[in-house]
Amino acid sequence: MTKRAIVLLSGGLDSATVLAMANAAGFETYALSMRYGQRHSSELEAAKRVAAELGAKRHEIIDLDLRRFGGSALTDDALDVPTDGAAGGIPITYVPARNTIMLSLALGWAEAIGGRDLFFGANAVDYSGYPDCRPEYVAAYETLANLATKAGVEGDRFHVHAPIIDMTKAEIILAGVKLGVDYGLTVSCYKADDDGRACGVCDSCRIRRAGFEAAGVPDPTRYQTPN
Protein backbone atom coordinates (compact mmCIF):
# COMPACT_ATOMS: atom_id res chain seq x y z
CA MET A 1 0.00 0.00 0.00
CA THR A 2 1.35 3.41 -0.98
CA LYS A 3 2.18 5.66 1.97
CA ARG A 4 1.41 9.28 1.17
CA ALA A 5 2.94 12.23 2.97
CA ILE A 6 2.45 15.97 2.75
CA VAL A 7 5.72 17.90 2.97
CA LEU A 8 5.74 21.63 3.69
CA LEU A 9 8.12 23.08 1.13
CA SER A 10 9.27 26.69 1.38
CA GLY A 11 12.01 26.44 -1.23
CA GLY A 12 14.75 26.75 1.36
CA LEU A 13 17.55 24.44 2.41
CA ASP A 14 15.78 22.84 5.36
CA SER A 15 12.51 21.95 3.66
CA ALA A 16 14.33 20.61 0.59
CA THR A 17 16.25 18.26 2.87
CA VAL A 18 13.06 17.16 4.59
CA LEU A 19 11.43 16.38 1.24
CA ALA A 20 14.42 14.20 0.34
CA MET A 21 14.17 12.49 3.73
CA ALA A 22 10.48 11.73 3.25
CA ASN A 23 11.26 10.27 -0.16
CA ALA A 24 14.03 8.14 1.32
CA ALA A 25 11.63 6.87 3.99
CA GLY A 26 9.47 5.38 1.25
CA PHE A 27 6.67 7.92 1.10
CA GLU A 28 4.92 9.14 -2.01
CA THR A 29 5.40 12.84 -1.40
CA TYR A 30 3.05 15.73 -1.99
CA ALA A 31 4.69 19.13 -1.60
CA LEU A 32 2.77 22.09 -0.20
CA SER A 33 3.94 25.69 -0.40
CA MET A 34 2.21 28.92 0.54
CA ARG A 35 2.22 32.34 -1.07
CA TYR A 36 1.62 34.14 2.20
CA GLY A 37 2.89 37.61 1.35
CA GLN A 38 6.59 36.95 1.81
CA ARG A 39 8.90 39.67 0.53
CA HIS A 40 9.96 37.90 -2.67
CA SER A 41 8.62 35.37 -5.17
CA SER A 42 11.97 33.66 -5.71
CA GLU A 43 11.34 31.41 -2.69
CA LEU A 44 8.33 29.86 -4.42
CA GLU A 45 10.20 29.53 -7.70
CA ALA A 46 12.82 27.61 -5.74
CA ALA A 47 10.09 25.41 -4.25
CA LYS A 48 8.89 24.55 -7.75
CA ARG A 49 12.41 23.58 -8.80
CA VAL A 50 13.00 21.47 -5.71
CA ALA A 51 9.64 19.68 -5.96
CA ALA A 52 10.35 18.78 -9.58
CA GLU A 53 13.97 17.77 -8.98
CA LEU A 54 13.10 15.54 -6.02
CA GLY A 55 10.13 13.94 -7.72
CA ALA A 56 7.19 15.09 -5.63
CA LYS A 57 4.03 13.44 -6.90
CA ARG A 58 2.26 16.78 -6.83
CA HIS A 59 3.10 20.33 -5.76
CA GLU A 60 0.45 22.77 -4.63
CA ILE A 61 0.95 26.47 -3.89
CA ILE A 62 -1.79 27.97 -1.72
CA ASP A 63 -2.56 31.70 -1.70
CA LEU A 64 -3.15 33.08 1.79
CA ASP A 65 -2.08 36.69 2.26
CA LEU A 66 -0.70 37.09 5.77
CA ARG A 67 0.48 40.61 4.91
CA ARG A 68 -3.05 41.66 5.82
CA PHE A 69 -2.17 40.80 9.42
CA GLY A 70 1.48 41.89 9.48
CA GLY A 71 3.36 41.32 12.71
CA SER A 72 6.55 40.01 11.09
CA ALA A 73 9.52 41.45 9.25
CA LEU A 74 8.79 38.91 6.51
CA THR A 75 5.27 40.21 5.86
CA ASP A 76 5.44 43.87 6.91
CA ASP A 77 7.65 46.24 4.91
CA ALA A 78 7.67 48.68 7.84
CA LEU A 79 9.75 46.20 9.84
CA ASP A 80 13.41 45.68 9.00
CA VAL A 81 14.85 42.22 8.49
CA PRO A 82 17.62 41.87 11.11
CA THR A 83 21.22 41.52 10.02
CA ASP A 84 22.94 41.54 13.41
CA GLY A 85 22.25 38.02 14.64
CA ALA A 86 19.83 36.68 17.20
CA ALA A 87 19.11 39.12 20.03
CA GLY A 88 17.34 36.67 22.31
CA GLY A 89 13.64 36.04 22.61
CA ILE A 90 11.37 35.46 19.64
CA PRO A 91 12.87 36.97 16.45
CA ILE A 92 11.00 39.63 14.49
CA THR A 93 11.17 37.24 11.51
CA TYR A 94 8.67 34.99 13.29
CA VAL A 95 5.44 34.99 11.27
CA PRO A 96 2.49 34.73 13.69
CA ALA A 97 1.18 31.14 13.76
CA ARG A 98 2.66 30.37 10.32
CA ASN A 99 3.56 26.75 11.00
CA THR A 100 0.17 26.12 12.58
CA ILE A 101 -1.58 27.63 9.57
CA MET A 102 0.52 25.67 7.08
CA LEU A 103 0.29 22.39 8.98
CA SER A 104 -3.48 22.79 9.12
CA LEU A 105 -3.59 23.12 5.34
CA ALA A 106 -1.32 20.09 5.07
CA LEU A 107 -3.56 18.17 7.45
CA GLY A 108 -6.63 18.89 5.36
CA TRP A 109 -4.91 17.80 2.17
CA ALA A 110 -3.52 14.68 3.80
CA GLU A 111 -6.91 13.58 5.07
CA ALA A 112 -8.46 14.22 1.66
CA ILE A 113 -5.96 11.97 -0.17
CA GLY A 114 -5.59 9.29 2.47
CA GLY A 115 -2.19 10.42 3.70
CA ARG A 116 -1.46 10.18 7.40
CA ASP A 117 1.99 11.73 7.60
CA LEU A 118 3.00 15.39 7.65
CA PHE A 119 6.63 16.51 7.31
CA PHE A 120 8.03 19.98 7.96
CA GLY A 121 11.42 21.54 8.49
CA ALA A 122 11.18 22.76 12.07
CA ASN A 123 14.61 23.25 13.60
CA ALA A 124 15.18 24.09 17.26
CA VAL A 125 18.95 24.54 16.98
CA ASP A 126 19.44 27.50 14.65
CA TYR A 127 16.04 29.11 15.26
CA SER A 128 15.54 28.37 18.95
CA GLY A 129 13.45 31.51 19.40
CA TYR A 130 10.58 30.27 17.22
CA PRO A 131 7.82 28.79 19.40
CA ASP A 132 6.48 26.64 16.55
CA CYS A 133 9.85 24.95 15.96
CA ARG A 134 10.05 23.17 19.32
CA PRO A 135 9.63 19.42 19.95
CA GLU A 136 6.72 20.10 22.31
CA TYR A 137 4.95 22.02 19.56
CA VAL A 138 5.33 19.09 17.15
CA ALA A 139 3.91 16.69 19.74
CA ALA A 140 1.05 19.05 20.55
CA TYR A 141 0.14 19.49 16.89
CA GLU A 142 0.08 15.73 16.36
CA THR A 143 -2.34 15.46 19.28
CA LEU A 144 -4.52 18.17 17.75
CA ALA A 145 -4.46 16.45 14.35
CA ASN A 146 -5.84 13.28 15.85
CA LEU A 147 -8.50 15.07 17.87
CA ALA A 148 -9.70 17.34 15.07
CA THR A 149 -10.13 14.98 12.11
CA LYS A 150 -12.49 12.19 11.12
CA ALA A 151 -9.55 9.89 10.46
CA GLY A 152 -7.99 10.66 13.81
CA VAL A 153 -11.08 10.02 15.92
CA GLU A 154 -11.69 6.79 14.02
CA GLY A 155 -8.23 5.57 15.00
CA ASP A 156 -6.48 6.13 11.66
CA ARG A 157 -3.80 8.23 13.26
CA PHE A 158 -1.77 11.07 11.82
CA HIS A 159 1.94 11.45 12.46
CA VAL A 160 3.81 14.75 12.35
CA HIS A 161 7.49 14.44 11.44
CA ALA A 162 10.17 17.07 12.07
CA PRO A 163 13.26 15.03 11.17
CA ILE A 164 15.78 17.87 11.35
CA ILE A 165 14.55 19.44 14.57
CA ASP A 166 17.68 18.62 16.59
CA MET A 167 20.23 18.89 13.77
CA THR A 168 22.75 21.66 13.18
CA LYS A 169 22.79 23.35 9.80
CA ALA A 170 25.99 21.49 8.92
CA GLU A 171 24.38 18.16 9.81
CA ILE A 172 21.34 19.02 7.71
CA ILE A 173 23.51 19.88 4.72
CA LEU A 174 25.56 16.69 5.01
CA ALA A 175 22.39 14.60 5.27
CA GLY A 176 20.96 16.31 2.20
CA VAL A 177 24.13 15.84 0.18
CA LYS A 178 23.97 12.10 0.88
CA LEU A 179 20.38 12.10 -0.38
CA GLY A 180 21.28 13.97 -3.56
CA VAL A 181 19.79 17.37 -2.72
CA ASP A 182 21.00 20.12 -5.06
CA TYR A 183 21.21 23.10 -2.73
CA GLY A 184 21.89 25.36 -5.68
CA LEU A 185 18.16 25.11 -6.40
CA THR A 186 17.17 26.46 -2.98
CA VAL A 187 16.66 29.99 -1.68
CA SER A 188 16.95 30.68 2.05
CA CYS A 189 17.48 34.46 2.08
CA TYR A 190 14.89 36.72 3.72
CA LYS A 191 15.68 39.46 1.17
CA ALA A 192 16.46 37.56 -2.03
CA ASP A 193 16.04 39.47 -5.27
CA ASP A 194 13.72 38.41 -8.09
CA ASP A 195 16.46 36.22 -9.55
CA GLY A 196 16.84 34.34 -6.27
CA ARG A 197 20.19 35.88 -5.40
CA ALA A 198 20.81 36.12 -1.66
CA CYS A 199 21.61 39.33 0.20
CA GLY A 200 24.39 37.63 2.17
CA VAL A 201 23.79 39.67 5.34
CA CYS A 202 20.43 38.64 6.82
CA ASP A 203 20.36 36.12 9.66
CA SER A 204 19.20 33.33 7.36
CA CYS A 205 22.08 33.97 4.96
CA ARG A 206 24.61 34.02 7.78
CA ILE A 207 23.36 30.75 9.24
CA ARG A 208 23.30 29.10 5.81
CA ARG A 209 26.82 30.23 4.90
CA ALA A 210 28.19 29.11 8.28
CA GLY A 211 26.49 25.75 7.78
CA PHE A 212 28.24 25.10 4.49
CA GLU A 213 31.56 26.16 5.99
CA ALA A 214 31.12 23.87 9.00
CA ALA A 215 30.07 20.99 6.76
CA GLY A 216 33.05 21.46 4.46
CA VAL A 217 30.70 21.59 1.49
CA PRO A 218 31.07 24.25 -1.26
CA ASP A 219 28.36 26.88 -0.92
CA PRO A 220 26.30 27.00 -4.16
CA THR A 221 24.39 30.11 -3.06
CA ARG A 222 24.25 32.95 -5.58
CA TYR A 223 24.78 36.29 -3.85
CA GLN A 224 23.72 39.76 -4.96
CA THR A 225 27.20 41.03 -4.10
CA PRO A 226 30.21 38.71 -4.45
CA ASN A 227 31.67 37.84 -1.06
UniProtKB/Swiss-Prot annotation:
Its cofactor is Zn(2+). One of its GO terms (biological process) is queuosine biosynthetic process. Its EC number is 6.3.4.20. InterPro entries: QueC (IPR018317), Rossmann-like_a/b/a_fold (IPR014729). It catalyses: 7-carboxy-7-deazaguanine + NH4(+) + ATP = 7-cyano-7-deazaguanine + ADP + phosphate + H2O + H(+). Binds 1 zinc ion per subunit. Zn(2+) binds at residues 189, 199, 202, 205. Keywords: ATP-binding, Ligase, Metal-binding, Nucleotide-binding, Queuosine biosynthesis, Zinc. This is 7-cyano-7-deazaguanine synthase. The lineage of its organism: Bacteria, Pseudomonadati, Pseudomonadota, Betaproteobacteria, Burkholderiales.
